[in-house]
Amino acid sequence: MQPYLDLMRQLLEHGTVKSDRTGTGTRSLFGHQMRFDLSKGFPLVTTKKLHLKSIIHELLWFLKGETNIAYLKDNGVRIWDEWATEDGELGPVYGRQWRAWPTPDGRHIDQISQVVEQIRTRPDSRRLIVSAWNVAELPDEGISPKDNARAGRMALAPCHTFFQFYVADGRLSCQLYQRSADVFLGVPFNIASYALLTLMVAQVTDLEPGDFVHTFGDVHLYSNHVEQAKEQLSREPYPLPKMHLNPEVKSLFDFRYEDFTLEGYQAHPHIKAPVAI
């Protein structure tokens, strides 16, 4: 995970001090890219322990097309609680856009099913893309996330905005464009989530995993995460673990939490840090 640590160090040393929506303040860079060869291990940060259960359940929740946090809460995942309404609604966030993008004529497009079929039938297509950036349903920046959700808009604008698959030599790669990235808390989750999605899609399309490429717009370190970042950078990373998927699963939507086994994950202790709301 050296590319991730190098990015955090670069933010500490060269980041531009900026204000932000939350009022916390950040050190920010614009335009950065990391690449992880998924054949060399699963890119899960080892310089602090991550809650893999949350990462897996959130991804499965996205793939279900759900936008209510009930499934997450039922499985002990609280990462979306701060932005949901009293009824657990978040508005048309990732799952809705991935699985049921609304069209002007009242239909809905299942982008995930569509892209899996395209990978199988047209692997050389340059349109193997899934987007969560639906301009018509973005939140009003003048009101709170909960009020946006109550009004039928997204509680939060998508941070991981769109992703593209690429097939070459029997290997499936994925590139994510992330417009906004919280490097200390969010990015380790995002890396693992999209790496896992790539493994899953590769399995159901009979391909080998290739690279996960992570491209950033505004990548930032919040001012109240600086000391935590320094502590993390003082630690020596461990070798990457391996992720095993149940080989019996043939449909992307049939994966369950029990179908994932992480082998050899050795990590330094968790580092607490506040979430910028």
UniProtKB/Swiss-Prot annotation:
One of its GO terms (cellular component) is cytosol. Pathway: Pyrimidine metabolism; dTTP biosynthesis. The active site is at 159 (nucleophile). It is found in: Cytoplasm. (6R)-5,10-methylene-5,6,7,8-tetrahydrofolate binds at residues 51, 182, 276. Pfam families: Thymidylat_synt. DUMP binds at residues 21, 126-127, 179-182, 190, 220-222. GO terms for biological process: dTMP biosynthetic process; dTTP biosynthetic process; methylation. Signal peptide: none annotated. InterPro entries: Thymidate_synth/dCMP_Mease, Thymidate_synth/dCMP_Mease_dom, Thymidate_synth/dCMP_Mease_sf, Thymidylate_synthase. It catalyses: dUMP + (6R)-5,10-methylene-5,6,7,8-tetrahydrofolate = 7,8-dihydrofolate + dTMP. Keywords: Cytoplasm, Methyltransferase, Nucleotide biosynthesis, Transferase. Its main location: cytoplasm. Catalyzes the reductive methylation of 2'-deoxyuridine-5'-monophosphate (dUMP) to 2'-deoxythymidine-5'-monophosphate (dTMP) while utilizing 5,10-methylenetetrahydrofolate (mTHF) as the methyl donor and reductant in the reaction, yielding dihydrofolate (DHF) as a by-product. This enzymatic reaction provides an intracellular de novo source of dTMP, an essential precursor for DNA biosynthesis. Homodimer. HAMAP family: Thymidy_synth_bact. Belongs to the thymidylate synthase family. Bacterial-type ThyA subfamily. This is Thymidylate synthase. The gene is thyA.
